[in-house]
């Protein structure tokens, strides 16, 4: 099992770890209208799925803003940001920060994303939140890029991700 750190704590990641080449599972998440939606989207060249612990964190907000900016530049790519925040909180934060060009989804109801993508934080002060991670899926829903950020306080490798999307 993979591990990540936050300050002095080390977390075991729970759930089924996906590898590059695996078919990505389609899971139910909750949107800003409290409606259940499927993660996987049809008819897009690439799908970037970005998970983070909480949009209230400064690094998490930077990550969401970065992907919002990229979403405006790459119309053939679908961007989703997923956290365990309640959809109401997600909406308030994104509205205040001008984040509007990507899908903001919550895994709070079923934890299905965290468990099926292997990014649910295990025992510790952040238990039950999502590890900072990025998955890129191709048009068939196959994982072609995966990054789990080892230190939760750091941002993903945006340059490596953008190379995959070119």
From Swiss-Prot:
Active site: 60 (cysteine sulfenic acid (-soh) intermediate)
Enzyme Commission number(s) of this protein: 1.11.1.24
Pfam families per the UniProt record, alphabetical: Redoxin
Keywords, alphabetical: Antioxidant, Disulfide bond, Oxidoreductase, Peroxidase, Redox-active center
GO molecular function, one term: thioredoxin peroxidase activity
Top enzyme class: oxidoreductase
Disulfide bonds: 60-94
Span of domain Thioredoxin: 18-166
Chemical reaction(s) catalysed: a hydroperoxide + [thioredoxin]-dithiol = an alcohol + [thioredoxin]-disulfide + H2O
Record-linked CDD domains: PRX_Atyp2cys (cd03014)
Function: Thiol-specific peroxidase that catalyzes the reduction of hydrogen peroxide and organic hydroperoxides to water and alcohols, respectively. Plays a role in cell protection against oxidative stress by detoxifying peroxides.
More about this protein: The active site is a conserved redox-active cysteine residue, the peroxidatic cysteine (C(P)), which makes the nucleophilic attack on the peroxide substrate. The peroxide oxidizes the C(P)-SH to cysteine sulfenic acid (C(P)-SOH), which then reacts with another cysteine residue, the resolving cysteine (C(R)), to form a disulfide bridge. The disulfide is subsequently reduced by an appropriate electron donor to complete the catalytic cycle. In this atypical 2-Cys peroxiredoxin, C(R) is present in the same subunit to form an intramolecular disulfide.
Assembly description: Homodimer.
Similarity section: Belongs to the peroxiredoxin family. Tpx subfamily.
Name of the protein in question: Thiol peroxidase
Gene that produces this protein: tpx
